[in-house]
Swiss-Prot record:
This is Nuclear receptor-binding protein. Residues 1-70, 409-437 are annotated as: Disordered. It comes from Homo sapiens. One of its GO terms (molecular function) is protein homodimerization activity. It comes from the Eukaryota.
Length: 535
């Protein structure tokens, strides 16, 4: 088993104080121009800036540093305060969220449930969901709080973007609307496929963020576990029309509440704003009905009406909505190829595209569609697909702007809720038992497995990419025999210190699933060509 380790370094993104003048794909730029005139800061402003960057507190591990500056971009039920913080290892800004429990005993009663919920949230790995990094409890003599670190979204909310669009007398681009809806539904489908399902419960245009490249991220997943047992008093929601009618009427809500909220977001994205009663933020049902009637596309109107049905059981699931005619398009070969490249990027050299295209004859024919008698065939030249455009498209696919929804969506890898108390490891029959390595305690947040045939019927080659919770990547590879004992292989990885014991069963399941896929694909192949399968 060979290993390559690399520490992933993330860029800090755009400066939160400067607003990008770029717009989402398919939309006219609506951001105000940035003037080049600058003036010297006054001593009072400099002092205020220094106060905001002052470090108030550190995490127990020393990695996260809380600043004085509060984050006002989110309105999350159950969260008492949110501050800007610094990730000292990655060099990026994050959000330091605090949940205050009224009494220490209240936290103790809920401790196990709180930990289980946050363990699930940290495992979430989706390009369209704001990332949860870490959490810990701070328990004092007479009070307790839970602190958790989330990704910082320096870009504005979707609500802000829609307001700017309306102010500049622009209209919503249909392609952008479809792209945004697809990204949001992809994230909701991922959350709802957890076991048990994770209900967002706070989906509004204020809690959906849009980046300068058109990437959508939903944030503010506030679990009911902290909503119902904290010091925070719930104030009247300013966006009541986003909440399903059954809120407050039933004890246990379902994922259908997120579908209702999504429908309201989709409507607001389409019409830019749903008019309320004058100064009041309350939006009556009549205003919602009027906004729906403004929609010219009957498919779009039906799509939104399905989401806003008063009976929860009649609302479609996020997965079903992805296949609604208003959204669904058969993916192009270009998109399928891009997802294939991105899915195997750990096996492709960084400069592969540049090497392939630098000696290419741009006047050569890339593809040709034959035509009938008397008609010229339709040709596509290499010059019509410049390398820079391909690079940009691959980057957009990698970032999650074009999720592939026509096939099975990625499912969350469920964490092991209870610690494994028995450290018994079956002995390996392939090699002598090695000396015990240093025990790995970090969790694996993402597993990718690839199997390809090397010698037909004799052996295969396994490549495994593991992303640990501290952003460390492990790239492992080995030869795999047709009759390989997968549980023993996973146990050997634990013994060698490559994965934690808590991740052993998850890895075993992934390896067995990928091997079954590989065997099925190989048996279905009519010739002896090499077969490659990834999971």
């Amino acid at each position: 088993m060979s290993e390559g380790e690399s520490q992933t370094v993330l860029s800090s993104g755009s400066d939160p104080k400067v607003e990008s003048s770029s717009s989402a794909p398919g939309l006219t730029s609506v951001s105000p121009p940035v003037t080049s005139t600058t003036s010297a800061a006054s001593p009072e402003e400099e002092e205020e800036s220094e106060d905001e960057s002052e470090i108030l507190e550190e995490s127990p591990c020393g990695r996260w540093q809380k600043r004085r500056e509060e984050v006002n971009q989110r309105n999350v039920p159950g969260i008492d305060s949110a501050y800007l913080a610094m990730d000292t290892e990655e060099g990026v800004e994050v959000v330091w969220n605090e949940v205050q429990f009224s009494e220490r005993k209240n936290y103790k009663l809920q401790e196990e449930k709180v930990r289980a919920v946050f363990d699930n949230l940290i495992q979430l790995e989706h390009l369209n969901i704001v990332k949860f990094h870490k959490y810990w409890a701070d328990i004092k003599e007479n009070k307790a709080r839970v602190i958790f670190i989330t990704e910082y979204m320096s870009s504005g909310s979707l609500k802000q973007f829609l307001k700017k669009t309306k102010k500049n007398h622009k209209t919503m681009n249909e392609k952008a609307w479809k792209r945004w809806c697809t990204q949001i539904l992809s994230a909701l489908s991922y959350l709802h496929s957890c076991d048990p399902p994770i209900i967002h419960g706070n989906l509004t245009c204020d809690t959906i963020f849009i980046q300068h490249n058109g990437l959508i991220k939903i944030g503010s997943v506030a679990p009911d576990t902290i909503n119902n047992h904290v010091k925070t008093c719930r104030e009247e929601q300013k966006n009541l029309h986003f909440f399903a009618p059954e809120y407050g009427e039933v004890t246990n809500v379902t994922t259908a509440v997120d579908i209702y909220s999504f429908g309201m977001c989709a409507l607001e994205m389409a019409v830019l704003e749903i008019q309320g009663n004058g100064e009041s933020s309350y939006v009556p049902q009549e205003a919602i009905s009027s906004a729906i009637q403004l929609l010219e596309d009957p498919l779009q109107r039906e799509f939104i009406q399905k989401c806003l049905q008063s009976e929860p059981a009649r609302r479609p699931t996020a997965r079903e909505l992805l296949f609604h005619p208003a959204l669904f398009e058969v993916p192009s070969l270009k998109l399928l190829a891009a997802h294939c490249i991105v899915g195997h990027q750990h096996m492709i050299p960084e400069n592969a595209l540049e090497e392939i295209t630098k000696n290419m004859d741009t006047s050569a024919v890339l593809a040709e569609i034959p035509a009938g008698p008397g008609r010229e065939p339709v040709q596509t030249l290499y010059s019509q697909s410049p390398a820079l455009e391909l690079d940009k498209f691959l980057e957009d696919v990698r970032n999650g702007i074009y999720p592939l929804t026509a096939f099975g969506l990625p499912r969350p890898q469920q964490p092991q809720q209870e610690e494994v108390t028995s450290p018994v490891v079956p002995p390996s029959v392939k090699t002598p038992t090695p000396e015990p390595a240093e025990v790995e305690t970090r969790k694996v947040v993402l597993m990718q497995c690839n199997i390809e045939s090397v010698e037909e019927g004799v052996k295969h080659h396994l490549t495994l990419l593991l992303k640990l919770e501290d952003k460390l990547n492990r790239h492992l590879s080995c030869d795999l025999m047709p009759n390989e004992n997968i549980p023993e292989l996973a146990a050997e990885l634990v013994q060698l210190g490559f994965i934690s014991e808590a991740d052993q069963s998850r890895l075993t399941s992934l390896l067995e699933e990928t091997l079954n896929k590989f065997n099925f694909a190989r048996n279905s192949t009519l010739n002896s060509a090499a077969v490659t399968v990834s999971s």
